[in-house]
Structures are given as C-alpha cells and as structure tokens.
Amino acid sequence: EIRHINGLYAFLDELARRHPGLILDNCAAGGRRLDFEMMRRCIVLWRSDSTWGAKTFPQNVQAMTHGLSYWLPLHGLGAAATDDLALRSGMGACGGFSINYRDPKAVLALRMYLDRYLKIRPIFTGDYYPLTAHSLDKTAWIAWQYHRADLNESVVQAFRRPEATSETLTVKLRGLIPEQRYEIGRAHV
C-alpha cells in the first residue's frame, strides 16, 4: 500500500512539474486521502461521498465542516437536494450540486441559494471559530463562525438538529469590535 501512495505522490508531482500552475482537486474518500502530503499537492473540493443519499446527510455534512475547518482552510462538499437545510448544510468555501437540472423548481431553488451564497462566499476564507462542541447528536445544536477581520464581517452557521428541545442557542461571537454597531441578517428561521 505504501508503494501505491508514494507512486500517487510521484504522479502528482510530475503533473505539477509538467504543467506549472495546475490546480489539482482531491476527492478525500471520506477523509482517507486528507493526509498532509496530499494537502500539499491538492485542494479538497469534495470531502466525502458518504453523505450522498444518507438519512443522516445534514448531520454528517455539518460535522465534517465543524471538524475539518479547524485545520483545513479550503474544503468543500455541496448538496444532492435543493431543500434549504441540505443547501445550507453543504455551504462553505466551495461546493458542488447534484440536482435534476431539467426540473425548473430545482433550478430555481438552486439559483436562489446561489444568489444568497455568492454574497457571503468571500467570508468563508476568513478565520474559523467553532461555537459549539463537535457533535453528531440529533438533540444538539451545532454552530460555527467564519470571520474576516479585514472586512469586519462574519458568517455564523447554526443548525438546530431535528430532536433538539431548545429553540434558541446562545453563543459568543469572535472578532467583534466593542462599541461597533452590526447588522444581522438571517438566511433561514
């Protein structure tokens, strides 16, 4: 197995040598290809196929974003559905979508999501702050914040899991300037 991995590294190095500026995407295979050597050679636009069609899709995606963002600044996933929870759960620095593009309702839902997403996308390159503990628990909230100090803007993603009894979540936001006034918008209630 190690010869296979070393061969893969050599292959990627040769591609980069022959094609300067080439950007390589690494499907992370559920995290099995998220080692430091691969991260040096590729970006991870697709973390895992394990979430497609899974009954735990939102929780899995949310947990991946919450955990990976500690140490991997650019990674992505996306959504295979156009409901608001699926789209927001897959939101991050990059992403992809697997929908029926012949379905006008699906295309409209994706268009509305993209209009919203494109306004905040630059913030996903900012500092990352987890606002809750990491959890797959369906009774818990999970939340995190991306903050761009240079823009004085943040995005907070907070998800109330399906069996959570608390209707509200109190968190301490990072990067706020004392005495500064802030405008708060909601993507979904």
Where would I find each of the regions flagged by the language model?
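Active-site-proximal substrate-binding groove within the catalytic cores of carbohydrate-active enzymes
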Residues: L8-R186
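The substrate-binding groove and active-site-proximal loops of carbohydrate-active enzymes
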Residues: E1-N6
